[in-house]
């Protein structure tokens, strides 16, 4: 009996809430703007070039024609840690895969210190 009474009360309360909110199409906090806010000297957000809070590139930094490998390697080299030296020239890395693997091993082992004598990376 109590369960039926509780279900009935929930149903009645739900119908009251639905009827009361029928008159409003939008929630109270939603505000329509007829015209975009225009402040002198500022561009609207959809026109702004700094949407992602990144720096704007100068024309000197922009590289128009990149091949597939360069398109991948350029961002990696830009974000490369400054403390690590590149031992092998960039052109040699593209030509010879064996030298690339040996350079990678030498940089990893150089960072390990005494563990490089064991021959394990962990």
Curated annotation (Swiss-Prot):
Keywords per UniProt: Amidation, Cleavage on pair of basic residues, Neuropeptide, Secreted, Signal
Protein name: Allatotropin
Transmembrane segments: none
Propeptide: 24-40, 57-122
Lineage of the species this protein comes from: Eukaryota, Metazoa, Ecdysozoa, Arthropoda, Hexapoda
Protein's organism: Camponotus floridanus (Florida carpenter ant)
Role, per record: Neuropeptide stimulator of juvenile hormone synthesis.
Tissue: Expressed in brain and ventral ganglia but not in the retrocerebral complex (at protein level).
Any single GO CC term annotated in Swiss-Prot or TrEMBL for this entry: extracellular region
Localization annotation: Secreted
Annotated positions of the Phenylalanine amide modification: 53
GO biological process, one term: neuropeptide signaling pathway
Signal peptide (residue range): 1-23
């Amino acid at each position: 009996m109590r369960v039926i009474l509780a279900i009935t009360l929930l149903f009645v309360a739900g119908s009251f809430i639905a009827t009361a909110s029928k008159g409003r199409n939008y929630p109270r906090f939603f505000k329509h703007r007829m015209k975009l806010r225009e402040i002198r000297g500022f561009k609207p957000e959809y026109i702004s070039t700094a949407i992602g809070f990144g720096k704007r590139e100068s024309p000197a930094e922009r590289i128009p024609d990149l091949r597939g490998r360069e398109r991948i390697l350029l961002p990696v080299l830009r974000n490369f840690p400054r403390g690590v030296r590149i031992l092998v020239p960039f052109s040699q890395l593209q030509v010879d895969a064996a030298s690339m693997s040996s350079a990678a091993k030498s940089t990893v082992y150089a960072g390990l210190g005494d563990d490089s004598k064991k021959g394990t990376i962990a």
